[in-house]
Amino acid sequence: GRLTRRDTASWQDKSWIAGIDLGEVSKAYDWNELVSKGVINDTPGSIPITIVLTPDQKGLFAFRRHTVEQQLTFRNDTLTDGTADYALTGGAMDTSSSSLYILPVYQEYWHSWRTFHPHTLR
């Protein structure tokens, strides 16, 4: 019904977002952009992060990257920076690389996220 229906436009009260709370900073990401790109690399509050939505839109993940320069992309079911590959658990696929740090990420309505994170970036 009306209370649970999602608004497919961006940044409307009932639009979906992917939200992260890093303590000193929280940020909401437009769900439509995430669906379109699959991967968003960002640096909120100088913390390098990557948010991933799987192609079937059933898996949402966030990771802290090792450096700002490291940019992750999604290939099949693997994240890669062109040098190292990572599983969606954040684990490095080879022993010469360090694993990524998993971050909590939330799929919420925009109005709900901004209510509980009033200073959120977007």
What is the role of each PLM region?
Residues 1-122:
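Mid-to-C-terminal functional-domain signal that highlights helix-capping/loop sites
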